[in-house]
Regions:
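N-terminal Rossmann/SDR dinucleotide-binding element
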Residues: 2-111
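SDR active-site strand-loop-helix element
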Residues: 42, 72, 112-116, 154-160, ...
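Hydrophobic/aromatic anchor residues within beta-strands of the central parallel beta-sheet
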Residues: 94, 131, 154, 212-215
Length: 257
């Protein structure tokens, strides 16, 4: 960096997000294995994917880890808008592509964070076929790519929806407790897709020794959620901001903790 230049923060004007990133960098997370490595993040413009990109870039700035971040995006314009300052800083390389097609990238890749997925409940219902194919074909392409690159590690971002509907008398569930999922409901395109992809990951680990781990995420929200996001928490927030009544389409008996 030349004298007089100001190094931009990862989250630009969002001070809350920036404080969160720097707090994580100052913690004792076991991050040194990524030093000097290349990390591919799919779904990089999404809520979780973008946070991964920002966090790794923050490690580069604060700890000089020299992680090469490959942000895979479908929309090049959106990717440049979100990460242009990090591209200019040399932290991020944009890889424009669709996970539903084979991944084309000539350089080495050491780690993969696979977060590309359909995320809107409305989309699951209106486009169940695409939801399923994005999960299965998309992750299959990423796993094939991981096999070719002989990666050191991969994380697949799954969902608590793989647990289905638990028994009514169950106070707590473990990772080994799986409830019912209605296979004939188009809304199940997401949860059944996630279940099948977890099996696909386990199969690649068994047959091709791909070092893939699975993280089952709960409802995820925070700074960076798009205003038009179709999930229920975003609709509640919009109703509050726009002073509209909240309209429930169920009896409201579902409980999450």
């Amino acid at each position: 960096m030349e004298n007089g230049e100001v190094e931009m923060n990862e989250c630009m004007e969002n001070e809350i997000m920036q404080q969160d990133l720097e707090m994580l960098v100052d913690s004792d997370l076991p991050i040194t294995a990524l030093e000097g490595k290349s990390v591919l993040v799919t779904g990089a413009t999404g809520l979780i994917g973008s946070q991964m990109v920002y966090l790794l870039a923050c490690y580069n700035r604060m700890r000089n880890l020299q992680i090469h971040i490959i942000a895979m995006v479908r929309n090049e314009e959106k990717g440049k808008k979100m990460f242009s300052h990090l591209i200019g800083r040399g932290d991020v390389e944009l890889l424009v592509g669709d996970i539903n097609r084979p991944v084309v990238y000539s350089d080495s890749v050491d780690y993969i964070i696979h977060g590309a997925s359909a995320t809107s409940s409305k989309y699951f219902v209106s486009n169940p076929v695409e939801t399923i194919y994005t999960a299965l074909d998309g992750t299959s392409n990423i796993l094939k790519f991981a096999t070719e690159k002989k990666i050191n590690g991969m994380v697949y971002l799954s969902s608590l929806e793989v647990y289905g509907t638990p028994e009514k008398d169950a106070d707590l569930i473990t990772e080994n407790d799986y409830g019912y999922i209605e296979p004939l409901s188009v809304r199940s395109s997401y949860s059944e897709g996630k279940r099948m992809v977890e099996c696909l990951c386990a199969s690649y680990a068994h047959e091709y020794s791909v070092p893939v781990k699975i993280a089952r995420l709960s409802q995820t929200f925070g700074p960076g959620v798009a205003y038009e996001d179709g999930r229920v928490f975003a609709e509640f927030a919009r109703c509050a901001l726009e002073q509209r009544d909240i309209v429930l389409h169920t009896q409201g008996h579902t409980v999450r903790s």
